[in-house]
C-alpha cells in the first residue's frame, strides 16, 4: 500500500471539551472528538472517530487515575506515575515521556515548506482509513507485529497485520497477527504502540516508500484507537500490553510434552501403530494430533454424536499407552452435510447481504485429482451460534479427545455479512480470535476430568489470543532457511505477547529434512515452550537412521527433564506476559552486541540457546553480559563476546547463566510419570547464586540476608554446581 498525505485530513486539536479523573477529550479540526485516557502508569489510549463498532472483547482493562494539566502555551499534559503524554496543537503533535525523558513522539518528517509530511493523526477523506505516524531515530529498532518469519527488527519493512493462512514460512503472510510494536528506544527508555482494532493494519516501519525516519501506520476501520506505552525496558512494555489485552492462561503439563502431528492422509489406526512404536523405542511423547477426519468430517462427527461407547479400537490403544488426543477442526460446514441445513435455518452461518448462507469453495487434494468443495462458515458473532458450536464439542470430548487444534484454512471473504453487523473486511481477523475462544471454552467445559488446565492449539490468532494458549506455527520448507524462519516466527510471536508457541519439527511440505537438519531442528525446538513433530510416511525419528534416532531420544529426554523449569517460566508469563522463549532484544535490550543475533534466544531466565543453522555444527554465539557455563563441557565463558562454537551432532550450544539455578526432573516417557508434588531429580547451580528459586518442595535458593544466597535441597535431589563449588552453600532442606 502507498500513502499520499494529500489524501488525508490532518487532524488538529482545537480546544479541550473537558477533563476527567482519567484523562481528557478534545475537539478536532475534522469534527471528530479525540479522547485520551490513562490506563495505568505508562499506558495511554487515544481514540478518535465515530463510536466504535464491535471490539470483540479485546481490551480487558479499565481507565485509571491520571492528572491532567494545561501549560501557559496551551499544551496539555496527562500524567500518571513516571509517564506523561503531552498534546500540542498547530499542528497536532504528541510527546510521550518516561521519567521526564522523551521516548516517543509524533513524526518529525517535514516537506520543503516545513509542514509535517506525515500527520500525527490523519483521516482519509473518503472514510474507512485512518493514519498515525511516529518519529524514529537513526538506528532505532522496532520489534513485534506477531508471527513474522523475516528479520525480528522490522525497521525498513512494510508489513500488514492480517490473519492469513501462512502456508509456509517464506513470506510475511502469517496466521498469528498482533498490531503491536515496540522499541528498546535510544537509551531514554522503551516504548510501544498498539492499534486496537479487528481490521487490517498496514505498518511502514522506517520504510523508504513512506518515510525512512518514521513509523507510519494505516488502519482500515471507521475509527482510530491507539494505545501508546512507555517504560524502562521492553519487558515493561509487554507487561503493560498484556495488562490491557489479557494475560496468558496457564497450560496443562501434558501440553509441554512432544506432540506427534500425523500426516493428513494417515489412517487413525496407522497413527496408533506409530505412537506405539514411540513407546516401544522409548522416545518420549504425550500427544497425538490426529488427521482431521479421524472421526470423519468434524462437523459430521457432531451430528453423529460420537461417544465413548463407540470409540474405535485405535483410540483405546492410544489411551492404553497414555497418549493425549488432539483432533484438528475447522468451522467449515459442508453444504452436503445435514448440519448445514440445521445451522442455516437458525441463521448460525455467515451470510450474504441477502441473508443467505455465504458459500465458500476450495479445491482439495492433489492437483491431478483435486475435488471442489463447497462449505459455509459458522457465525461466531451470533451468541447462540457460538454457544451451539461450543456445546457441540461435548460429544467429541466424551469420545476421548483431550484438545482440539483450530485450523484456519479459510480467510473470511470481505463481502460476508455477520450477525453483529460487521462485514468480512472487519471480521476476518477477529474470526480467528472468536473461533479459538469458542474452542477454548469448550475444552474448559467438557475436557476429561483431571486433565489439568484447558488448552487449545490454534494456527491463527489476533490480539487477545494469548489468553487462550497456545499458538502453533506453520510447516516450513525442509531446509536450513526453513529452520531459521521457524525460529524467527516463534521469537517474533513472543515479542508480541504470545507467551506459548509450538514450532513444528519437520514438515509435510515436499521432501523430508536430511538427518542432520532433523536433529538440529529438534534440538532447537526442545527449548521453546511447546514442540510438535511432523510424522507419518518417512518422517518418524527411527527412519532418519540409528544415530539420529538415538540423538532425538537423548534430547527429548532432556526436554522432559526441563518441564519443571518450563512450568516456572509459564507461571511468570501468566503474571507478566514475558514469553518462555525470549529474543535477545527482549532479554538483553541494553546489549547492542547480542541484538543482531536474531535466532538466539533465552529459554526462561537461566538458559541461553544458540541454534545451529548450517551443516557442520559450527555457529557464532553472542554471549550477553555476565558469565555463562557451557552445558556440554561446563566451561565458563565471560559475557559480552562472540564465541565461535563447534558442536558434534549429539551436542547443542546451550549455556547456563551465572547466578541462576536450573531445576530438572526425571527423564520420563510421558508427563503422566512426573510426580505432581515431587517433580525434581536435580538442581544445576551456575556459579554463585544471585537470584532466588522458589515454587518447589524439594529444593530452593533463598537469601540468607548476610552472605548472599543459600541452596537448600532434599537428599533425593542431586545438586550440581557449575564452576567453583566452594562459593556455593548447600544445606539440607
Model region roles, listed by residue range:
Residues 1-255, 259-276, 287-290, 304, ...:
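N-terminal accessory segment at the very beginning of proteins
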Residues 23, 33-34, 166-169, 177-179, ...:
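Generic recognition of flexible, low-complexity loop/linker segments
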Residues 240, 273, 384, 388-392, ...:
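A non-catalytic, amphipathic alpha-helix used as a structural packing/dimerization or gating element
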Amino acid at each position: 500500500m502507498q500513502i499520499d498525505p494529500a489524501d488525508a485530513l490532518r487532524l488538529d486539536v482545537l480546544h479541550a471539551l473537558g477533563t476527567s479523573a482519567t484523562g481528557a477529550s478534545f475537539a478536532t479540526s475534522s469534527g471528530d472528538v479525540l479522547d485520551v485516557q490513562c490506563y495505568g502508569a505508562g499506558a495511554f489510549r487515544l481514540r478518535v472517530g465515530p463510536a466504535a463498532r464491535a471490539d470483540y472483547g479485546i481490551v480487558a482493562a479499565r481507565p485509571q487515575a491520571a492528572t491532567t494539566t494545561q501549560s501557559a502555551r496551551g499544551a496539555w499534559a496527562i500524567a500518571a506515575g513516571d509517564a506523561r503524554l503531552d498534546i500540542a496543537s498547530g499542528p497536532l503533535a504528541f510527546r510521550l515521556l518516561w521519567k521526564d525523558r522523551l521516548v516517543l513522539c509524533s513524526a518529525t518528517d517535514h516537506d520543503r515548506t516545513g509542514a509535517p509530511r506525515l500527520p500525527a493523526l490523519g483521516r482519509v477523506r473518503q472514510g474507512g482509513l485512518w493514519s498515525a505516524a511516529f518519529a524514529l531515530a537513526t538506528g532505532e529498532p522496532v520489534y513485534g507485529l506477531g508471527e513474522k518469519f523475516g528479520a525480528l527488527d522490522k525497521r525498513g519493512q512494510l508489513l500488514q497485520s492480517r490473519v492469513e493462512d501462512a502456508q509456509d514460512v517464506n513470506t510475511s503472510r502469517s496466521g498469528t497477527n498482533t498490531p503491536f510494536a515496540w522499541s528498546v528506544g535510544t537509551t531514554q527508555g522503551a516504548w510501544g504502540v498498539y492499534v486496537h482494532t479487528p481490521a487490517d493494519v498496514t505498518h511502514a516501519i522506517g520504510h523508504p516508500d513512506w518515510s525512512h525516519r518514521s513509523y507510519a501506520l494505516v488502519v482500515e476501520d471507521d475509527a482510530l484507537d491507539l494505545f501508546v506505552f512507555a517504560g524502562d525496558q521492553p519487558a515493561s512494555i509487554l507487561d503493560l500490553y498484556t495488562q490491557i489485552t489479557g494475560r496468558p492462561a496457564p497450560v496443562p503439563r501434558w501440553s509441554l510434552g512432544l506432540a506427534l502431528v500425523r500426516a493428513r492422509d494417515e489412517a487413525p489406526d496407522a497413527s496408533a501403530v506409530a505412537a506405539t512404536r514411540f513407546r516401544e523405542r522409548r522416545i518420549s511423547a504425550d500427544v497425538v494430533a490426529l488427521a482431521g477426519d479421524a472421526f470423519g468430517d468434524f462437523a459430521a462427527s457432531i451430528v453423529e454424536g460420537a461417544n465413548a461407547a463407540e470409540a474405535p479400537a485405535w483410540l483405546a490403544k492410544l489411551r492404553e499407552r497414555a497418549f493425549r488426543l488432539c483432533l484438528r477442526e475447522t468451522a467449515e460446514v459442508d453444504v452436503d452435510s445435514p448440519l448445514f441445513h440445521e445451522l442455516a435455518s437458525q441463521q448460525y452461518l455467515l451470510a450474504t447481504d441477502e441473508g443467505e448462507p455465504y458459500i465458500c469453495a476450495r479445491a482439495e487434494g492433489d492437483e491431478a485429482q483435486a475435488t471442489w468443495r463447497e462449505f459455509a462458515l459458522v457465525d461466531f458473532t451470533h451468541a447462540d451460534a457460538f454457544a451451539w458450536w461450543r456445546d457441540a464439542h461435548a460429544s467429541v470430548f466424551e469420545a476421548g479427545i483431550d484438545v482440539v487444534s483450530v485450523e484456519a484454512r479459510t480467510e473470511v471473504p470481505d463481502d460476508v455479512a455477520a450477525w453483529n453487523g460487521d462485514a468480512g473486511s472487519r471480521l476476518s481477523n477477529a474470526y480467528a480470535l472468536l473461533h479459538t475462544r469458542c474452542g477454548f471454552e469448550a475444552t474448559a467445559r467438557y475436557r476429561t476430568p483431571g486433565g489439568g488446565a484447558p488448552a487449545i492449539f490454534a494456527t491463527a490468532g489476533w490480539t487477545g489470543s494469548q489468553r487462550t494458549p497456545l499458538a502453533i506455527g506453520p510447516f516450513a520448507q525442509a531446509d536450513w532457511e526453513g529452520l531459521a524462519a521457524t525460529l524467527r516466527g516463534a521469537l517474533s510471536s513472543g515479542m508480541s505477547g504470545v507467551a506459548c508457541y509450538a514450532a513444528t519439527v519437520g514438515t509435510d511440505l515436499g521432501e523430508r529434512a536430511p538427518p542432520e537438519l532433523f536433529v538440529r531442528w529438534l534440538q532447537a525446538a526442545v527449548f521453546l515452550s511447546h514442540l510438535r513433530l511432523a510424522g507419518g510416511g518417512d518422517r518418524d525419528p527411527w527412519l532418519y537412521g540409528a544415530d539420529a534416532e538415538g540423538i532425538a531420544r537423548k534430547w527429548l529426554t532432556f526436554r522432559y527433564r526441563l518441564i519443571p523449569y518450563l512450568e516456572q517460566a509459564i507461571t511468570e508469563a501468566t503474571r507478566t506476559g514475558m514469553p518462555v522463549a525470549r529474543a535477545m532484544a527482549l532479554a538483553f535490550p541494553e546489549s547492542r552486541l547480542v541484538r543482531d543475533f536474531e535466532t538466539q534466544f533465552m529459554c526462561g531466565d537461566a538458559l541461553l540457546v544458540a541454534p545451529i543453522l548450517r551443516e557442520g555444527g559450527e555457529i557464532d554465539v553472542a554471549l550477553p553480559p555476565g558469565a555463562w557455563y557451557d552445558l556440554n563441557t561446563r566451561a565458563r565463558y565471560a559475557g559480552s563476546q562472540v564465541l565461535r562454537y563447534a558442536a558434534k551432532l549429539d551436542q547443542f550450544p546451550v549455556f547456563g547463566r551465572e547466578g541462576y539455578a536450573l531445576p530438572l526432573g526425571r527423564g520420563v516417557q510421558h508427563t503422566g510419570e512426573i510426580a505432581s508434588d515431587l517433580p525434581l531429580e536435580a538442581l544445576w547451580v551456575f556459579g554463585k547464586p544471585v537470584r532466588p528459586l522458589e515454587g518447589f518442595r524439594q529444593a530452593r535458593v533463598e537469601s540468607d540476608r548476610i552472605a548472599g544466597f543459600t541452596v537448600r535441597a532434599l537428599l533425593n535431589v542431586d545438586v550440581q554446581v557449575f564452576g567453583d563449588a566452594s562459593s556455593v552453600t548447600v544445606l539440607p532442606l
